[in-house]
């Protein structure tokens, strides 16, 4: 299976650490963050990771000149200008010739999600897309995703006020998508998957949420980036860091 890994952002919330370095190339314990992300994909049968690159693509290409990471083939898709999340997904997937269902992962999220179970759920429900959802205490910082009893997404509410959130289950940044989703995304300009693409698919009843209370950390801020270091040192995933 192939995966698009979103790594093109500027990492502004991690400055000054990211002034000259993409956040996915910052160290997490003993290796760059991207190696944890791609290593997790490898553990679940992904054989190609398509990196959607924007800021400082040279840092990635110089670090992995043979285009392999954690035993996974890397394909580089370098944006000429920022395309936002949906635009980046379309650009990377079409550049690599993706024509079967594929994964999308946020490159700054560390998780022990069972990706095989997510894919099985997606295949069983027959939608166009399936999102990994996790519960959080404060959903106001995230995309909130209420679902019905069958897992069908009822709405996609991006960063609502805490007292107005329809659920505490949020978008955890790992998706299974059918290639037809790419046709929904404008071929040029900035398009947000959270604010435009997913709400449109949900409105047609074709988007599902897979609820799983996994380990999960969005490393995009200084506190959460540091927390990831402590978590891996403490082996909160239940395994030694080398086997994450």
Residue ranges and their predicted role:
Residues 2-5, 13, 19, 27-106, ...:
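Conserved N-terminal catalytic core of the sugar/cofactor nucleotidyltransferase
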Residues 25, 144-147, 198, 209:
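A structural signal for short hydrophobic beta-strand segments in well-ordered beta-sheet cores
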Residues 27, 133, 146, 176-178, ...:
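Short, well-ordered beta-strand micro-motif
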Residues 46, 101-103, 110, 116-123, ...:
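Catalytic-core segments of class I nucleotidyltransferases/pyrophosphorylases
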Residues 55, 130-147:
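Short beta-strand-to-loop element that shapes/binds the nucleotide-sugar donor at the catalytic cleft/hinge
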Residues 77-79, 132, 210-212:
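Conserved beta-strand termini and adjacent loop/short-helix elements that scaffold enzyme active sites
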Residues 88-89, 140-145, 175:
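Adenylate-forming
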Residues 240-244:
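Extended beta-solenoid/beta-helix repeat architectures
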């Amino acid at each position: 299976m192939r995966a698009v890994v979103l790594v093109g952002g500027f990492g502004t919330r991690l400055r000054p650490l990211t002034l000259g370095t993409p956040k996915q190339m910052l160290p997490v314990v003993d290796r760059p963050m991207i190696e944890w992300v791609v290593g997790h994909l490898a553990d679940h049968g992904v054989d190609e990771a398509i990196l959607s690159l924007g800021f400082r693509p040279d840092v990635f290409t110089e670090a992995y000149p043979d285009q392999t990471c954690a035993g996974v083939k890397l394909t580089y898709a370098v944006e000429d200008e920022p395309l936002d999340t949906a635009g980046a997904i379309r650009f990377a997937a079409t550049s690599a010739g993706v024509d079967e269902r594929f994964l999308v992962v946020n490159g700054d999220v560390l998780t022990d999600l069972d990706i095989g179970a997510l894919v099985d759920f997606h295949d069983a429900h027959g939608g166009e897309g399936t999102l990994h959802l996790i519960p959080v205490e404060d959903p106001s910082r995230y995309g909130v995703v209420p679902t019905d009893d069958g897992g069908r997404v009822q709405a996609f509410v991006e960063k609502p006020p805490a007292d107005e959130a329809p659920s505490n289950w949020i978008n955890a940044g790992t998706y299974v998508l059918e290639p037809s989703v790419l046709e929904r995304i404008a071929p040029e300009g900035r398009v947000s998957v959270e604010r435009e693409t997913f709400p449109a698919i949900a409105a047609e009843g074709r988007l599902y949420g897979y609820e799983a209370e996994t380990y999960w950390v969005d490393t995009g801020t200084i506190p959460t980036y540091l927390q990831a270091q402590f978590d891996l040192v403490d082996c909160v995933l239940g395994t030694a860091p080398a086997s994450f």
